[in-house]
Amino acid sequence: MQTNTRLVFLVEVAILGAIAFLLDLLTSYIGKMPQGGSISLAMVPVLIMGFRHGIKGGLLTGFLLGLLQTIMGYTTIVHPVQGFLDYFVAFTVVGAGGIFYKQVQNAINPLNKGRLIAYVAAAAFLGSLLRFAAHTIAGAVFFAEFAGDKPVLIYSAAYNASYMVPTFIICSIILVLMLTTSKSLILKRK
């Protein structure tokens, strides 16, 4: 039985990682920033996996998303360390929102809408903040020439906030709507 549970977990990681990649690909056609980055829905499947399986599921799904982006060539990489920070680290840490796994599970069954909204928003905020930090560090170190005479760290933070703040808001709203209408998305079958 343990092998079956692990297999289901890995299949879910693969499916949600692929969905995250496709959502990122589709939303990037709406508009991409000049030095990379865009408003994206890719965090939604990563956080759903975190809500289903905890931090381990979220981190692994985020890592797979970064790996798929890199393998498929949908990246802006100027240096290996920048690529590692902007893709592997940034998307892996989105899964840290899975730290709210138990709270989200408890808020959804039975449904306590206020608590669910609070914990989903907190999870999305944590994942977004950590992703924002990874992108900001990479931007400050590897895209400094675009800052001109502005302080590099402030320029990088403002640049990355321009798409990360809307991404956080949109993903939070979508997650709340999805989970309040279909709690089976995160409840595991017994």
How should these model regions be labeled?
Residues 2-4, 8-22, 61, 81-140:
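Short helix-perturbing small/polar motifs within transmembrane alpha-helices
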Residues 1-52, 56-60:
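Hydrophobic transmembrane alpha-helices
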Residues 3-6, 35-37, 72, 110-117, ...:
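Helix-boundary and loop/linker segments of multi-pass membrane transporters
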Residues 1-17, 122, 152-190:
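Alpha-helical transmembrane segments and their cytosolic interface
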Residues 22-38, 64-100, 147:
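Interfacial aromatic-anchored transmembrane helix boundaries in multi-pass membrane proteins
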Residues 27, 31, 72, 76, ...:
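Membrane-interfacial segments
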Residues 37, 122-128, 132-144, 158, ...:
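Hydrophobic alpha-helical membrane segments of integral membrane proteins
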